[in-house]
Amino acid sequence: HRIVPCPDCKLQPEWMNALARRACALLEANGIAPYDEETGKGRVRHLYMRQGWHSGQRLLCFVVNGNGLPNEAEICRTLQQEFLLTTVLINRNPARTNVILGRDTRTVLGPGVIEDTLAGVPIQMGVHEFYQVNTPAAELLYAKAKEFARLQPDDFLLDLYCGMGTIGLSMKPHCRRLVGVEVVPQAVEGAKTVAAHLGLPPEEADFYCMDAGEA
């Protein structure tokens, strides 16, 4: 990869562009260098931002080559206050790879997740869970998928590669049982939490952490 300036991306909310510019200025002021894939040196690999479409809640995660940032508390608090962030996290990724996220994430400020709804399903998400970036389009696709499925009250619905389970859970009122399969542990736990929040016992909606090809 080559790092190039992109101060005004048209595909994301303007606050994300403004935060990226401000964060880069703070990092430079603190002498914190960006990560270089070729040398494996430098601290900051990515700025990872999310926003709940309906809730408006905002998440920021620094993906770092190391355990954290110099002056971490001050930098994170400044950005949280200036951009009304719901939560700020640090993800540790020391591997020589172009994979974005590492395994270890810790919360610096806030609850560690943001909340939103998707097709009427309440969700909580951190950084590891897959989330459609265009929520209105996703909700239209969910509705079309439900129409094509033509579910009946006694049907068994298998949701493969289910992520947080939003597709299956949005269709659960129209079938007898739902089983979701997903390889990301955090997403599976999130799906189970949502199902419990909706009052669905495991015998009606359950989720398994495994490879869908082996399910």
Located regions from the model:
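SAM-dependent transferase fold signal centered on methyltransferase-like domains
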Residues: 1-106, 143, 147-154
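Rossmann-like S-adenosyl-L-methionine
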Residues: 71-82, 86-215
